[in-house]
């Protein structure tokens, strides 16, 4: 039987195979570049496209060793103290924290949103200083952000940490616009 010249199935299979091999080749080249850089690559940044903003932070290691950066002759991270485990993460955390203030659903509500990579409930502490009109955010007893508030008479009404994103809701404590209590 003579192959049908109109049959493109063999062309599709060869182009798919070629595309897969090209992707595999690119992956091997990137891994070789990381190997030349000492087996570790870490980058972070921000991409703004129109109304969208994307913050990214990645850490890639290849070769022998643990994901936390310790070698196999060091004690496992589960045997190290919590502060020792956090010290390596803290540099990354402080560099990649992003805090944003927004208006809430009601006119008297203010929402502070903080992206806190690698942070758990036990690590976070928030303090409201009404004299200074500021909200202080601490991670492991270190001040990582201080948000100056434009409203003198606010109180924290809700605080949640989900997927390493902290949301703090503040509301006015009085009905006046001037900030004076009646």
UniProtKB/Swiss-Prot annotation:
Region (Disordered) residue spans: 1-21, 65-106
Tagged with keyword Cytoplasm: yes
Lineage: superkingdom: Archaea
KO phenotype (gene knockout): A single deletion produces very low levels of gas vesicles, in situ. Deletion of gvpG1-gvpH1-gvpI1 prevents gas vesicle formation, cells still express gvpA1, in H.volcanii. A single deletion produces gas vesicles throughout growth, in H.volcanii.
Compositionally skewed regions (Low complexity) per UniProt: 12-21
GO cellular component terms attached to this protein's record: cytoplasm; gas vesicle
Main function: Proteins GvpF to GvpM might be involved in nucleating gas vesicle formation. May be important for the stability of gas vesicles. Gas vesicles are hollow, gas filled proteinaceous nanostructures found in several microbial planktonic microorganisms. They allow positioning of halobacteria at the optimal depth for growth in the poorly aerated, shallow brine pools of their habitat.
Descriptive protein name: Gas vesicle protein H1
Organism of derivation: Halobacterium salinarum (strain ATCC 700922 / JCM 11081 / NRC-1) (Halobacterium halobium)
Lineage: Archaea, Methanobacteriati, Methanobacteriota, Stenosarchaea group, Halobacteria
